Amino acid sequence: MSIKAEEISTLIKQQIQNYQSDIEVQDVGTVIQVGDGIARVHGLDNCMAGELVEFSNGVLGMAQNLEESNVGIVILGPFSEIREGDEVKRTGRIMEVPVGEELIGRIVNPLGQPVDGLGPILTSKTRPIESPAPGVMDRKSVHEPLQTGIKAIDALIPIGRGQRELIIGDRQTGKTSVAIDAILNQKDQDMICVYVAIGQKESTVRGVVETLRKHGALDYTIVVTASASQPAPLLYLAPYAGVTMAEEFMYNGKHVLVVYDDLSKQAAAYRELSLLLRRPPGREAFPGDVFYLHSRLLERAAKLSDAKGAGSITALPFVETQAGDISAYIPTNVISITDGQIFLQSDLFFSGVRPAINAGLSVSRVGGSAQIKAMKKVSGTLRLDLASYRELEAFAQFGSDLDQATQAKLNRGARTVEVLKQDLNKPLPVEKQVAILYALTKGYLDDIPVADIRRFEEEYYMYLDQNHKDLLDGIAKTGNLPADEDFKAAIEGFKRTFAPSN
């Protein structure tokens, strides 16, 4: 059988017609220097600020410095395998993280990858980690309470949904414990919580996760962790990843509580990156834009207007002080950005006042309008009582011959301090807080020995639960105080059954 030339030419023509040449154009650069989590790359002339790039070993990086001859890239992973001369590809994507309901109950790193060993997170939705904060007209003033379950905070320094409240203090003063209690108290409150651990020890993060799991709080919490062993770029990105996950819920009309533990370590990581990228250092060697680093993060916490779905993000950023110095650079920056601060003092902590909140230096600038009416009424004089007690306490150490009014103030102050103490991981419903503070401010505790106050409190709650549940339910439902005579009858009824210790 002979093959005809025409057949061959027809076959060749068909093959040529069917041939599709898929040309893939890639923007590729070359690593000219690498080390300490930073790579300088030549040849990525069209790279965008904040764009993700991919190294030849699959590790991702983020473009930070766009210079004339090279691009400064922070490496988001191990950099020991990256060598000079390696190829770097542009991805054309800005840094994004996965978002959505599927993340609830999971522990992820700042790139949104799971680190809890429970398999992949099945969500296709992502959001860019840098996005503009809601504008002025998209917001509404803070008016709904966020109950932390901590008497000292809910009474003296109330927090509203959509507020930014700084928690500031030295190391080992109970900052994390305050935030964990606030998360535990959001059970059945229709709140989603995001806990962002920045530069914490892995064992500490594990402890926090176990506490949340034990109390059933992991059912509504996302944990984002960039531990101390992670590269600095991941510590810098962690808070932005956390707030991005929270924004997805806020824009869908939900309420979110975000805890940043803590921003001092993020600022230190950002300082490290900036110095390695050869940006000019400023005060305490921080770069000039360290204020913007925190302001653009915390401005994304907001209470949205009804037209935008009325969702909210409440932010509890932490800042660690050195020897109680709240006038240092990062503390003053964050104090000026937030709507108030809760100052935890080591002297109080070691003297047994826990939570160790200094009522004089702590303030909530917008939370007062979010307090329920009942709490407003019973906590009105508390701050003054405490302040005058602290003043007189120092004075009373020198002289014993005190007049009756001064002695009464000291007695009331000692009982106030005792009532505001609270055990770890035992947040208290707001109606019970109101009940004990009512008894305190109306003078029903003045004849109870200070040593018996904690026992009195516990037995009082049990008595109310058994005999006057209607009073507690009334406060919880309406937010108002019951009639004075009803409350008076309940307290006096309990006091008749209470036996002080000898």
Curated annotation (Swiss-Prot):
It comes from Bacillus subtilis (strain 168). CDD domains: ATP-synt_F1_alpha_C (cd18113), ATP-synt_F1_alpha_N (cd18116), F1-ATPase_alpha_CD (cd01132). Its EC number is 7.1.2.2. GO terms for molecular function: ADP binding; ATP binding; proton-transporting ATP synthase activity, rotational mechanism. F-type ATPases have 2 components, CF(1) - the catalytic core - and CF(0) - the membrane proton channel. CF(1) has five subunits: alpha(3), beta(3), gamma(1), delta(1), epsilon(1). CF(0) has three main subunits: a(1), b(2) and c(9-12). The alpha and beta chains form an alternating ring which encloses part of the gamma chain. CF(1) is attached to CF(0) by a central stalk formed by the gamma and epsilon chains, while a peripheral stalk is formed by the delta and b chains. The F(1)F(0) complex interacts with SpoIIIJ and YqjG; YqgA is found in the same complex. It is a peripheral membrane protein. The lineage of its organism: Bacteria, Bacillati, Bacillota, Bacilli, Bacillales. It catalyses: ATP + H2O + 4 H(+)(in) = ADP + phosphate + 5 H(+)(out). Produces ATP from ADP in the presence of a proton gradient across the membrane. The alpha chain is a regulatory subunit. This is ATP synthase subunit alpha. GO terms for cellular component: membrane raft; plasma membrane; proton-transporting ATP synthase complex. Belongs to the ATPase alpha/beta chains family. The gene is atpA. It is found in: Cell membrane; Membrane raft. Keywords: ATP synthesis, ATP-binding, Cell membrane, CF(1), Hydrogen ion transport, Ion transport, Membrane, Nucleotide-binding, Translocase, Transport.
